[in-house]
């Protein structure tokens, strides 16, 4: 399955243009320091997301 992606400004970039800075600290690292050395990539960092794709499941 191929999902066409479109590029947008990330939420972090949009807020930076307005003079608002978001911290880069991952909450998992704050409460579980052992995660800082793990080789995982978290997909829940929406502030840095710049590609979006529309997905529909089933028929309406």
UniProtKB/Swiss-Prot annotation:
InterPro entries to which the protein is assigned, alphabetical: Aspartic_peptidase_N
Record propeptide residues: 1-35
Keywords in alphabetical order: Aspartyl protease, Hydrolase, Protease, Zymogen
GO molecular function term, any single one: aspartic-type endopeptidase activity
Signal sequence, renumbered to the chain: none
EC number in record: 3.4.23.-
GO biological process terms, semicolon-separated: proteolysis
Pfam families (UniProt xref): A1_Propeptide
Similarity comment text for this entry: Belongs to the peptidase A1 family.
Protein's name according to its UniProt entry: Pepsin-3
Organism: Thunnus orientalis
